[in-house]
Amino acid sequence: MPPRPRFDRRAPVRELPNINDRISYPQLRVVDSDGSQLGVISREEALEVAKERELDLVLVSEKADPPVCRIMDYGKFKFEQEKKAKEAKKKSHQTEVKEVKMRYKIDQHDYDVRIGQAVRFLKAGDKVKCTVIFRGREIQHTALAETLLRRMAKDLEEKAEIQQAPKREGRNMIMFLTPRKTPLVKKEEKEAAPTKAVRTIPAPPRPTAAKVAAQQA
């Protein structure tokens, strides 16, 4: 029997960035940290300039002739690149419609579970379809189902707003919630907000009878 093939379990080699001493090209076109051109200089001279600035020499265009390097704070540059990548990934998230199903006679524990599910969906930027399922003659209790859905909307009002009010859909009653774009300001917070004080100017004192008589004399 031929030997079984072995799988290479070694961790993949992580590609290191081409910065500072890892740059091997003898001649480089260097851009300074302020964007000015330092021209084509030797690798050693470029490293010395970066060292004087207490910055890094980073290879930004290896295919150019000669290769182009820039003097910069590589740690800060890497942080900004990762931040941009996260923002781009967040923007590329396609909104989905997630569904939360329940019965109109749901108990408190199961209701809390459905609330937790809805919160997770909303935080992920997805819309939530809240569905109350009727079986048999339960269809006559649409009023109770609507009350339940509006209760759910109220409990989630800090994170969601109603996109579509409760309505019948076949043998079910549904409601759509969408993530709230602006934070909700509660009524109590509005009432507690300090009002801008209005400066009042006191009226001048009225002259006494004695003072009036003295002025007429």
Curated annotation (Swiss-Prot):
Coiled-coil zones: none
S-S pairs: none
Region (Disordered) residue spans: 179-217
Keyword annotations: Cytoplasm, Initiation factor, Protein biosynthesis
A single GO cellular-component term on record: cytosol
Location of this chain's protein in the cell: Cytoplasm
InterPro entries listed in its UniProt record: T_IF-3_C_sf, T_IF-3_N_sf, Translation_initiation_fac3_CS, Translation_initiation_fac_3, Translation_initiation_fac_3_C, Translation_initiation_fac_3_N
Pfam families: IF3_C (PF00707), IF3_N (PF05198)
One GO-annotated biological process of the protein: ribosome disassembly
Span of the signal peptide: none
Assembly: Monomer.
Record-stated family: Belongs to the IF-3 family.
Protein function: IF-3 binds to the 30S ribosomal subunit and shifts the equilibrium between 70S ribosomes and their 50S and 30S subunits in favor of the free subunits, thus enhancing the availability of 30S subunits on which protein synthesis initiation begins.
Annotated protein name in UniProt: Translation initiation factor IF-3
Lineage, broadest ranks: Bacteria, Bacillati, Cyanobacteriota, Cyanophyceae, Synechococcales
Underlying gene: infC
